Regions:
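C-terminal-of-GTPase-core extension/linker across diverse P-loop GTPases
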Residues: 2-3, 8-192
Length: 192
């Protein structure tokens, strides 16, 4: 849980910590604390909530998968919502995408926006499946393995596009999507 002081907004230190979370590919929830001091009696004002959430999202755009919970630890406002979100992230970490449906989602995404070509070669997905991470952590990010013709043909931006389509289909709040590409030679390449 990345706790941000609502009175000071996202600081340089907050950005560094968020960057470490993103680099380590860890689950995350952003808690905007001290809401009582910012809201001045307008705690439930939807416009104020939206404005602050959008500002956080803009500054921490690289943690787009992390839900934002606005709360006040002092008054107890939305503290239960934070714990509910922690449980939701944990539950979704066990969600499995069926192989057939995953392949249909990826095929539709590639038909909607074809992968770029390198020279006269085009990236092709032979098939994809969700794998189980061998971590002992109780909350694991979903790991997808794509068996492809050549992992070197796909730019990171296109992997991000495919991860976004997976996220559109299956809700994985607070969880980064991990993608491994395996070429015909079998050596895995972790991309996203």
């Amino acid at each position: 849980i990345l706790v941000i002081d609502a009175t000071s907004g996202v600081t340089t230190q907050d950005k560094k910590i968020a960057g470490l979370i993103q680099e380590a590919k860890k689950p995350a929830i952003i808690a905007l604390n001290k809401w009582d001091l910012v809201a001045n009696g307008r705690e439930k004002d939807p416009e104020l909530l939206r404005e602050h959430t959008e500002r956080i999202r803009a500054e921490l755009f690289f943690l787009s998968y992390a839900p934002v919970v606005i709360l006040s630890a002092l008054t107890g406002t939305n503290v239960k919502r934070l714990f509910t979100m922690v449980e939701k992230v944990r539950q979704h970490s066990t969600r499995r995408a069926g192989t057939g449906e995953l392949n249909r989602v990826l095929k539709a995404a590639m038909e909607r926006q074809a992968p770029p070509t390198r020279g006269n070669r085009r990236f092709k997905v032979l098939y994809a499946a969700q794998a189980k991470e061998s971590s002992r952590s109780p909350v694991q990010a979903p790991l997808f393995v794509m068996f492809v013709n050549d992992p070197k043909l796909i730019p990171d931006s296109y992997v991000n596009y495919l991860c976004a389509r997976i996220r559109d289909k299956w809700e994985f709040p607070g969880l980064p999507i991990l993608m491994r590409l395996r070429g015909r030679e079998g050596a895995p390449t972790e991309v996203a």
